[in-house]
């Protein structure tokens, strides 16, 4: 999985409108992620997997791509050593760890390490 594009997220102010747009344009279908308190729709049948996520009014967004890594802590450390920035890792319960990053040119991306043993918050 090292370096493979594994996930993308498209921010939207209106998830119904965005689902209609991408569904019609690209033939995508969507399913509710089931994550409590978040308007987050997973693409079905796309490679890599993706999602449409609602952003709050006044926020702007840009698509975020996720690259797979074998060791998220080593990868975030390397991002910093190479002159980029990296957040501390955060959990994706039952799936793995992610970290938001920026490269030396200010481009945002995320890293993801699969680990299905990551517990839900409070567990």
Where are the predicted features?
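Vicinal oxygen chelate
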Residues: 5-13, 31, 55-123
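Amphipathic, alpha-helical segments enriched in basic
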Residues: 1, 5, 18, 44, ...
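Aromatic side chains
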Residues: 7-8, 21-22, 40, 66-67, ...
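Conserved short beta-strand elements that form part of the metal-binding/catalytic scaffold
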Residues: 28-62, 108-115
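Short glycine-rich loop/turn motifs that provide flexible caps or phosphate-binding loops at active sites
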Residues: 2, 26, 49, 67, ...
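Core segments of cupin and vicinal oxygen chelate
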Residues: 2-5, 9-48, 81
């Amino acid at each position: 999985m090292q370096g493979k594009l594994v996930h993308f997220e498209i921010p939207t102010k209106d998830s119904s409108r965005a689902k209609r747009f991408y569904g019609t344009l690209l033939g995508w279908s969507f399913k509710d992620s089931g994550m409590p308190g978040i308007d987050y729709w997973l693409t079905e049948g796309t490679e890599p997997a993706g999602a449409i996520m609602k952003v709050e009014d006044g926020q702007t967004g840009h698509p975020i791509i996720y690259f797979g890594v074998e060791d998220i802590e080593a990868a975030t450390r390397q991002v910093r050593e190479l002159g980029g920035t990296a957040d501390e890792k955060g959990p994706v319960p039952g799936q793995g760890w992610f970290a938001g990053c920026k490269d030396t040119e200010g481009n945002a991306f995320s890293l993801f390490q699969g680990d299905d043993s990551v517990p839900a918050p409070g567990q």
